[in-house]
Curated annotation (Swiss-Prot):
Compartment list: Archaeal flagellum
NCBIfam families noted in UniProt: arch_flag_Nterm, PRK08541.1
Propiece residues: 1-12
A GO cellular-component term linked to this record: archaeal-type flagellum
Name this polypeptide is given: Flagellin B2
GO MF term list: structural molecule activity
Keyword Glycoprotein: no
GO annotation, biological process: archaeal or bacterial-type flagellum-dependent cell motility
Function in brief: Flagellin is the subunit protein which polymerizes to form the filaments of archaeal flagella.
Family: Belongs to the archaeal flagellin family.
Keywords: Archaeal flagellum
Amino acid sequence: MKITEFLNNKKGASGIGTLIVFIAMVLVAAVAASVLINTSGFLQQKAATTGKESTEQVASGLQVLQIMGVHDSSNITKLAVYIAPNAGSSAVDLSQSVVTLSNGDVKSIFKYDTTDAAADKSYGAVKTGGSLFAEATLNISNMTNTQFGIIVIQDADGSCKAATPVLNKGDIVAIVLNLNETMTEPRTAITGSIQPEFGAPGIISFTTPATYLDGSTVVQLQ
């Protein structure tokens, strides 16, 4: 009997108040869903951007092909480091790159000077049959021991210019240095790198010859 009376006294919720509560719940759910969707989209775009940057960071960079030097019978006075972009690398701006060399006691840092390049003091190109170390190609002797020059070896699309020396697929250039003679005595271990703005550096590692022969002033070092 009491159970019947209890059930008879229960009434379903109805009226405008209930409708307002229901609509409010729907709106809250919609707002929450919108926030989740927007957050998901943002995170997806962020992940895609980060993935692309990481891929470029891993693939981009420079490789050292070989290193040639000129000696004066007692020291290496000029250095030419042949470089090219890594396979799959994005474009590399050499004006933002830094070259470092060290013999364990002295560390030198070289940068590219676009002002001197515009005046043809630190930029050149090897013509057919030309010499890399010829003063007509690039006046290396006038360069300071804190800057590097660029000699274009191969650049089909003309991307590596004096003011904007950009390397891309297929390009080969020589980074030339006017060295401090105290660094390059015989049997000296030289280490260093060519560090681009983004990506892996080109590694420099060689030991200077035990003796410098007068009959051959140009030597291959790496």
